[in-house]
Amino acid sequence: MKKVSWEKREKKKVAIERIDTLFTLAEKVVKYSPDLARRYVELALEIQKKSKVKLPRKWKRRYCKRCHAFLVPGFNARVRLRTDRMPHVVITCLECGHIMRYPYLREVKEKRKRKKD
């Protein structure tokens, strides 16, 4: 029983390391080979699906969900901050036009708390 859970843990650990390595490689090569970076992202996502591991937050927002391009602000992505009603970050993929929105309300609340103190 314990051996099985240990093996699962080890497999997940290896999967996370591989995913991290692939995203790091994608980050390095995206400037001169966007297609290779896209392939690295696709491989990382396949590993993530097969091993049923959560993608680390730092990488989750760095690729386009539609075309799997590795996003670099100013190169193939546009990043804007919006404060209408609910503050959020808008990331636009310049390769396929896909728009992703991420709220940053938690950060705003922390900033207000610090101002009051």
UniProtKB/Swiss-Prot annotation:
Residues involved in Zn(2+) binding = 64, 67, 93, 96
Gene3D superfamilies on file: 6.20.50.20, Immunoglobulin FC, subunit C
EC number of the protein: 3.1.26.5
Highest rank taxon of the organism:
Archaea
Q: Indicate the family of this protein.
A: Belongs to the eukaryotic/archaeal RNase P protein component 4 family.
Q: Which HAMAP family match?
A: RNase_P_4
Query: What is the protein name stated in its UniProt record?
Result: Ribonuclease P protein component 4
The coding gene here is rnp4
